[in-house]
UniProtKB/Swiss-Prot annotation:
Gene name for this UniProt entry: rpmC
NCBIfam families in the cross-refs: L29
GO cellular component: ribonucleoprotein complex; ribosome
Disulfide bond as UniProt keyword: no
Name of the molecule in the record: Large ribosomal subunit protein uL29
CDD domains: Ribosomal_L29_HIP (cd00427)
Pfam families named among the record's database cross-references: Ribosomal_L29
Length: 62
């Protein structure tokens, strides 16, 4: 999702997306440790998305 689209979301919707991404990132890490993850870039992409959402949530709360 684009950053502009994320900024238009409500804080509750962003929190739901954040929880989903955190679970997804956890699954990717477990797959990576057990050598089942094919595409390692998924780890970096989810980590970046998590950081973007956290930043937007903090900006909206300030």
């Amino acid at each position: 999702m684009d950053v502009k689209e994320l900024r238009n979301q409500s804080v509750s919707a962003l929190n739901e997306m954040l929880i989903k991404l955190l679970k997804e990132h956890f699954e990717f890490r477990m797959q990576h440790k057990s050598s089942q993850l094919d595409n390692f870039s998924k780890l970096g992409k989810t980590k970046k998305s998590i950081a973007q959402i956290k930043t937007i949530i903090r900006q909206k709360q300030a």
